[in-house]
């Protein structure tokens, strides 16, 4: 074993770089070419930017599901205000009539 120059970075040591360049082949030999090829091709790990998958858009001719909901009249959404007033008046009259205290 030859002594290694201590001033060299570990990734520049002799024998640390493969003699051939990396390629896009996924055969067994190329998957074990170097550590980078093994993680990228062999294990399928890549740390690059991921492309956003676009959502499927509904065709122009089809209606959206929101169009199928019928609109409700405003009186049902807000509630019956007169019924609440009558209930309050009935409660007040009952409390006045009961001499429990």
Curated annotation (Swiss-Prot):
Annotated segments matching region Cysteine-rich: 22-37
Biased segments, Basic residues type: 48-58
Pfam families, per this entry?
A: Tat
| Residue ranges, annotated region (Transactivation) | 1-48
Family membership: Belongs to the lentiviruses Tat family.
| Protein name (record) | Protein Tat
GO molecular function terms noted in the UniProt entry:
actinin binding; cyclin binding; metal ion binding; protein domain specific binding; protein serine/threonine phosphatase inhibitor activity; RNA-binding transcription regulator activity; trans-activation response element binding
Q: Got a GO cellular component term for this one?
A: host cell nucleolus
Additional notes on this entry: HIV-1 lineages are divided in three main groups, M (for Major), O (for Outlier), and N (for New, or Non-M, Non-O). The vast majority of strains found worldwide belong to the group M. Group O seems to be endemic to and largely confined to Cameroon and neighboring countries in West Central Africa, where these viruses represent a small minority of HIV-1 strains. The group N is represented by a limited number of isolates from Cameroonian persons. The group M is further subdivided in 9 clades or subtypes (A to D, F to H, J and K).
Feature type site, description Essential for Tat translocation through the endosomal membrane: 11
The PTM Asymmetric dimethylarginine maps to 52
Function field: Transcriptional activator that increases RNA Pol II processivity, thereby increasing the level of full-length viral transcripts. Recognizes a hairpin structure at the 5'-LTR of the nascent viral mRNAs referred to as the transactivation responsive RNA element (TAR) and recruits the cyclin T1-CDK9 complex (P-TEFb complex) that will in turn hyperphosphorylate the RNA polymerase II to allow efficient elongation. The CDK9 component of P-TEFb and other Tat-activated kinases hyperphosphorylate the C-terminus of RNA Pol II that becomes stabilized and much more processive. Extracellular circulating Tat can be endocytosed by surrounding uninfected cells via the binding to several surface receptors such as CD26, CXCR4, heparan sulfate proteoglycans (HSPG) or LDLR. Neurons are rarely infected, but they internalize Tat via their LDLR. Through its interaction with nuclear HATs, Tat is potentially able to control the acetylation-dependent cellular gene expression. Modulates the expression of many cellular genes involved in cell survival, proliferation or in coding for cytokines or cytokine receptors. Tat plays a role in T-cell and neurons apoptosis.
Residues recorded with modification N6-acetyllysine? 28, 50-51
The UniProt annotation places Zn(2+) 2 binding at 25, 27, 30
Q: Where is this region: Core?
A: 38-48
Gene that produces this protein:
tat
Q: Where does Zn(2+) 1 bind?
A: 22, 33-34, 37
A GO BP entry = DNA-templated transcription
- Residue interval(s) of motif Nuclear localization signal, RNA-binding (TAR), and protein transduction: 49-57
């Amino acid at each position: 074993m030859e002594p290694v120059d201590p001033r060299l970075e570990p990734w520049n040591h002799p024998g640390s770089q493969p003699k051939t360049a990396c390629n896009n082949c996924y055969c067994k030999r190329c998957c074990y070419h170097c550590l980078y090829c093994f993680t990228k091709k062999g294990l399928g790990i890549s740390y690059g930017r991921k492309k956003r998958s676009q959502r499927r858009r509904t065709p122009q001719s089809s209606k959206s599901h929101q169009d199928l909901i019928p609109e409700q009249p405003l009186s049902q959404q807000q509630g019956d205000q007169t019924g609440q007033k009558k209930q309050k008046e009935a409660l007040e009259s009952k409390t006045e009539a009961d001499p429990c205290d």
